[in-house]
Amino acid sequence: MQAAQLSWELENAVTLIDPQRDSLYRYDEETHKYLSDTRPWTKDPHYFKSVRISAVALLKMVMHARSGGSLEVMGLMQGYILPNTFVVTDAFRLPVEGTETRVNAQDEANEYMVSYLQSCREAGRMENAVGWYHSHPGYGCWLSGIDVSTQDMQQMSGPFVAVVIDPERTISAGKVDIGAFRTFPKDYTPPKEEQEEDEYQTVPLNKAEDFGAHASHYYSLEVSLFKSALDTEILSLLWNKYWVATLSQSPLFTTRDYGSKQMLDLSQKTRRVARGIESNPPRGGAPTQVRDQQLERVVKDGQRIVSEEVKGLLAAEVKMQLFQGIGGKQTVEST
C-alpha cells in the first residue's frame, strides 16, 4: 500500500514542504491586496509562469475527471496568487451538463459556486477562486475554441487559470496528464518563435483542426505539485480506501477502449500521410521537410502507444509473478 502511494508521488514529482512552512496554505491578505491593486498581469501577458497544486486538490480533480468517463466534467479551484505563481490548495466539483466535447455551466452551477465560496468564508477559509478545471477524455491537455472563450471571460474579472486533465491518458500512462493555461489579450500576438517552442503532443485527427486554430491564443504554465504534513495524513487515508483497486486493476483492461481508439486514430493519420506522399512525389525543398515532419509526428504517436502498452504488460507481469499461486502455496503448506 505504501509502495503504491510512494510510486504515485514519485511519478508525479510531489514534494513535501517543510512542516514549519505549512503557512503556505494560509491566505495572505496583504500580498493578495498588493497584487490586486498593482495588477502586474495587465502589463505582461506572460506574468504568471507557474501553478503549484496541492496533492489533495490534484487527487480530487483526477477522481472527478475519471468519474465522468467519456464525458467532460468541470470544477473550480481555490487558492491564492503569489508573484508569478498560482497556488491551488483545494478544488470542488460543479454541477454542470457535460458532453463528449464540452461542458456547459448553467445558472445552477453559478449559484452553487457562489454558495460554496460563501460557506468557505463563513468557516474561516478565505481562499479565492483562482481557476477552473475540466477534463479532455482521451485527447490531451489543450484549450479548444470554447475553452479559450471561457478563459477570456474569466480573466476579465481578475487573475484566473485554466487547468485541463486527461483521465484516459492518466490511467494509461500511470502519471497525471495535466496542463495549465492562460489566454493572451485580444490585442497581443505571440512571436512566431514562441509558438514553435511549444512541446509536441498527440491530438486525435478529429480534434486537430480545433487544436491548431486556437493554439496561438494561449500559453502554458509550469505545473508543480506539493503536499503538507496534513496532506500526508489525508493521502494515507485515501490510499487505505483505494490501494486494493490499484493492485487488482490493469491499465490494459481499464483503458482498452481508449487504446483501441488511439490505434484507430494512428491508422487514419498514417493513411492520410501516405496519400499525401503519393499525390505529391518528393522533389526536394520545403515540401519534403513538411512530409518529414508529418511522418515524424506519426512515428511519435506510434511510439507513445507502444510505450504505454509495454508499461501495462510489464505491470501485469510483475503482479502475476508476485501473486500468482499464493493461495495454492498456502494450502500446500497447511497440509
UniProtKB/Swiss-Prot annotation:
Effect of altering residue 147 to A?
A: Inhibits fruit body formation
User: Where does this protein reside within or beyond the cell?
Assistant: Cytoplasm; Nucleus
The catalytic activity of this protein is classed by the Enzyme Commission as 3.4.-.-
Cellular component terms per the entry's GO annotation: COP9 signalosome; cytoplasm
The chain positions of domain MPN read: 51-187
List the ranges annotated as motif JAMM motif: 134-147
Variant or mutagenesis effect after changing residue 147 to A: Inhibits fruit body formation
Extract the InterPro entries matched here. CSN5_C, JAMM/MPN+_dom, JAMM_MPN+_peptidase_M67A, MPN
| Major localization listed first in the record, in broad terms | cytoplasm
Q: Which GO terms describe its biological process?
A: cleistothecium development; hyphal growth; protein deneddylation; protein neddylation; proteolysis; regulation of cell cycle
Record keywords: Cytoplasm, Hydrolase, Metal-binding, Metalloprotease, Nucleus, Protease, Signalosome, Zinc
* SUPFAM superfamilies per record: JAB1/MPN domain (SSF102712)
Q: List ligand-binding residues for Zn(2+).
A: 134, 136, 147
Recall the GO molecular function terms of this protein's record: deNEDDylase activity; metal ion binding; metalloendopeptidase activity; metallopeptidase activity
Which residues belong to the signal peptide in this entry? none
Similarity field:
Belongs to the peptidase M67A family. CSN5 subfamily.
How is this protein organized at the quaternary level? Component of the COP9 signalosome (CSN) complex.
Describe its function.
Answer: Catalytic component of the COP9 signalosome (CSN) complex that acts as an regulator of the ubiquitin (Ubl) conjugation pathway by mediating the deneddylation of the cullin subunit of SCF-type E3 ubiquitin-protein ligase complexes. The CSN complex seems to link protein degradation to sexual development. Required for fruit body formation.
Give the domain section of the comments: The JAMM motif is essential for the protease activity of the CSN complex resulting in deneddylation of cullins. It constitutes the catalytic center of the complex.
Name assigned to this protein = COP9 signalosome complex subunit 5
Origin species, per record, is Emericella nidulans (strain FGSC A4 / ATCC 38163 / CBS 112.46 / NRRL 194 / M139) (Aspergillus nidulans)
